[in-house]
Amino acid sequence: KASVGFKAGVKEYKLTYYTPTYETKDTDILAAFRVTPQPGVPPEEAGAAVAAESSTGTWTTVWTDGLTSLDRYKGRCYHIEPVAGEENQFIAYVAYPLDLFEEGSVTNMFTSIVGNVFGFKALRALRLEDLRIPTAYVKTFQGPPHGIQVERDKLNKYGRPLLGCTIKPKLGLSAKNYGRAVYECLRGGLDFTKDDENVNSQPFMRWRDRFLFCAEAIFKSQSETGEIKGHYLNATAGTCEEMMKRAIFARELGVPIVMHDYLTGGFTANTSLAHYCRDNGLLLHIHRAMHAVIDRQKNHGIHFRVLAKALRMSGGDHIHAGTVVGKLEGERDITLGFVDLLRDDFIEKDRSRGLFFTQDWVSLPGVLPVASGGIHVWHMPALTEIFGDDSVLQFGGGTLGHPWGNAPGAVANRVALEACVQARNEGRDLASEGNEIIREASKWSPELAAACEVWKEIKFEFEAMDTL
């Protein structure tokens, strides 16, 4: 209200931005922040500061405030609760009016909500735990290029998880040797093989050579097995133009799927690639390289469930989501929380799984979670039980480390998977009978028996960092 007169000076954020009586709207974007204030800063002031600095506020009153309606545009901290078991930590809930965000831009959403506020001096640490994306905003995104059902129809594969394998050593192979490794894995029974996230176009293997040899491997293995095969050709590049050039070449080769590193490549590049993939019938596999830099600390950063939601909006058909049982981080309930966020249309709020809000995706296609990292045949029953049919299970070392080579390694994994799916369909309990199911299957498959022998004692047992 300009008529009241402009009063210069610094005033507390909580006078304007802490509104405990606010009723959230269906169109608001809601955020749950884990706030650790500096000593002496009350939680209401800290929560209000987060709301202010991530929306309309700045450190002092400015006369141009009178030229707009702050009540319409400001973020509001509407609820604060202490974190159980932690000293001086609070969950601050902030509501943002939808008008603050550009339609269809994950980039703009993150620039607003987490762009500036994390360096704020009044806070010791800050973590974005969850976002509620309103249906009105969801509808401005294309989302995944195809989604789970369309992918199954394209591949003609139903009723079981899909099997993949990352080609190792990740760096140093020539294109022809790389293509040979791909062929052996696909020929042995895998559905997919994968470029490692840091395989782009290096001196020892330029991207075009790799694409050609991998395409040859795909078509040769398809003709021999009668199954549709794919290799995640990594299109990630130094510029968006180069990335698109690689995706276009993949489409010209007639392969089914390409890949992108969405955090290092950036959301803008990722969304462009996702749009191209839908328009041209390519599936899009997403790797989350760099995620742990952002999500591993418990009290600072962004939780992966938020990055997973952002990916579903930006677009991708697969995304790596931890394993719960392998060598990489992932606590079971929390992991399953964001796995459901990726796959389901509607997910209820459930704090025991880290879900702070109910999320309605209104017909945005689902994303297949990918379990990858330090897993082998003995993990197959647990993975089948935990992730269910709509998932991709990726065994890199667990395929290529087989004593007889890549193709027998692929056979071992496929036999183990088929045995677990059959046992589950017959009503057996994979959690308690898993080892027995694998042992029974290995009697009929020398490849599986050899794999069981090699990896019988390997475990990666550490406490998960990410607890509720």
Curated annotation (Swiss-Prot):
Cofactor note: Binds 1 Mg(2+) ion per subunit.
Keyword Protease: no
Modification sites for N6,N6,N6-trimethyllysine: K7
Alphabetical list of InterPro entries matching this protein: RuBisCO, RuBisCo_large_chain_AS, RuBisCO_lsu_C, RuBisCO_lsu_C_sf, RuBisCO_lsu_fd_N, RuBisCO_lsu_N_sf, RuBisCO_lsuI
Modified residues (N6-carboxylysine): K194
Family: Belongs to the RuBisCO large chain family. Type I subfamily.
Function: RuBisCO catalyzes two reactions: the carboxylation of D-ribulose 1,5-bisphosphate, the primary event in carbon dioxide fixation, as well as the oxidative fragmentation of the pentose substrate in the photorespiration process. Both reactions occur simultaneously and in competition at the same active site.
NCBIfam families for this protein: PRK04208.1 (NF003252)
Stated name of the protein: Ribulose bisphosphate carboxylase large chain
Organism: Cornus alternifolia
Organism lineage string: Eukaryota, Viridiplantae, Streptophyta, Embryophyta, Tracheophyta
